[in-house]
Amino acid sequence: MMNEDISIIDGHNSFLTEKSTVLLTQAKRTLEDEKEMITPPSSTVRKTMKEVNKRPSHPLSPDHSSPIAPSKAKRQRSDTCARSNGNLTLEEILQSLERRRINGELAKKPPYSYATLICLAILQSQEGKLTLSQIYHWIHVHFPYYKQKDASWQNSIRHNLSLNDAFIKTEKSCDGKGHFWEVRPGAETKFFKGENRGYEFVKDSLQDIGKYFEIDSTLDELEQVESGEGNDDLPDEEEREEAGKFPSIEIQLNSSPILRVSQLHHIPQLKTDNSVLNPHENLESMRNMIENDVNNIDSLEPPYVMKKYHTSLGLPSLVNAKDHFQAGVKNNNITQANRFNTLPITSAKSPQNFRKYFTSFNSNFEDLSPLRSNVGAGSLLDPLPYSPLKLYDQKNLALMSKPQSQQSYSNSQLPPPPSSHGSDLLKTPKMRHSDGLEKTPSRLISTPKDGNSILRKWQTPSHLFEDLYCSPLFRAIETPIRYITTPGGTLETQISPRKSSAPDVLTSATNSKFASSGLFGVDVYSVWKRATEKISDGNNTTDSNQKHHPYHNHPSNDSGNEKN
């Protein structure tokens, strides 16, 4: 009985064990299902490093990527654009320069750093030092990628020179415009990888670096790129060199081609569509062209001849343009005096009535009568020789007054010349009150036009009257003065508010017979006339007059008085 009960109990226990195992398995499955429902695939559950490393490295497709933050592919540097800053040896750099020359890549961007370019420029020089401008020039010529007008790479060159301790600033240049820069000895390893052969070896190796560059072809390609023109439009080598020395000037007229002056010491050539006009070679043709049109007053073609016209009177020109041009050709004025005023010959015509466009400026150059031919060759401001005997002679006075007078005695207010009549000798001649007496008596304001109008200085000590007339006091107060003669022979001043100027010494010296005969305000001529009249009348008081004037009895003494 007991064995049966034990077997029943064991069977029941095994059943319970199996049942519990099934229940536990179901419970685990239920928990896993609930866990999957609660935790989505992209939840914030911390993941291990292994799971993170197992993620694929390829980017997401456009369908699954976010439009807000698109993925950017990482930029990869190519081997050709990589700059060598101490990564290449000296031989590798020279080989790369040779490949660039063979492949025709000299105008492309070089794969070298700015510090390497500076080092190459300095060490290739014979003295091993260059100024900043020389470094610019060497880099621009050997690597045309860097334009001369571009300031960005030039700023980088300056920064490298200032911040890199491999470059040393030494003495000042000869012109005083900059300092020399050198490479510090022992700093070659910064530019050339594994270089331990010394400074002098590197410098000697770079002395023949010019063979890796085609300088002539590089300059031609550079000019084509900068100007955008072909080889046919490029200037010759000599013109290119001269253009660098002298500034280029372009003159553009409305109806004429461009005139380019590349040299200041050469006569410019006039470039036209068909030919080039050179004033030296085509002088005869230019003379013929201008002589054909010289009589045409409406043509304004070079050389521009200055003509004088009376704008107010309408008189003809005082200068013959044809004669003026022929005289200029004989003196070679076109090729020498006007070498910088040579302009292209055009067919531009002025208006038909171009005279009315003349301004008042032209009136300053017109003369109402041609100049006299008896002008002296000496200085215009020198005084004339003093001749007291002939100066006051009646014939000479008459001759002197004729060329200066513009009006007849009938139309003027002047009295007729003194005659030999006795009544006329008793009167003191009056000074001429003409318009000339009311001009400013300054002798330095205007230049005399002929020899007859030269200023005659007063025959007095220290030129007192001249100092009085030219005194700055009268010019400052601007007080007009009129000089009036009195019977006593003295000069009086009269303020005239209606007159705007002072008497003219220049005119009074020539028009008046007694302008220069006054001796300290005394009219010697009138005194002498009155004395001779009294002698001829046979007055009883002759002896008393001779006591006061003893020199009147001897004619030879008269000249002496006048000399005094």
Curated annotation (Swiss-Prot):
DNA-binding region(s) in UniProt: 108-199
GO molecular function: DNA-binding transcription factor activity; DNA-binding transcription factor activity, RNA polymerase II-specific; mitochondrial transcription factor activity; RNA polymerase II cis-regulatory region sequence-specific DNA binding; sequence-specific DNA binding
Entry keyword Phosphoprotein: yes
Tagged with keyword Cytoplasm: yes
Biased composition (Acidic residues): 224-241
Region listing for Disordered, in residue ranges: 33-80, 224-246, 401-448, 536-564
Biased composition (Polar residues): 402-413, 554-564
InterPro entries membership: Fork_head_dom, FOX_domain-containing, TF_fork_head_CS_1, TF_fork_head_CS_2, WH-like_DNA-bd_sf, WH_DNA-bd_sf
Function recorded in the entry: Transcription factor regulating the cell cycle specific transcription of a spindle pole body (SPB) calmodulin binding protein SPC110. Required for full induction of SPC110 transcription in late G1. Binds to DNA consensus sequence 5'-[AT]AA[TC]AAACAA[AT]-3'. Dosage dependent suppressor of calmodulin mutants which have specific defects in SPB assembly.
Note: Present with 358 molecules/cell in log phase SD medium.
Protein known as: Forkhead transcription factor HCM1
Highest classification ranks of the organism: Eukaryota, Fungi, Dikarya, Ascomycota, Saccharomycotina
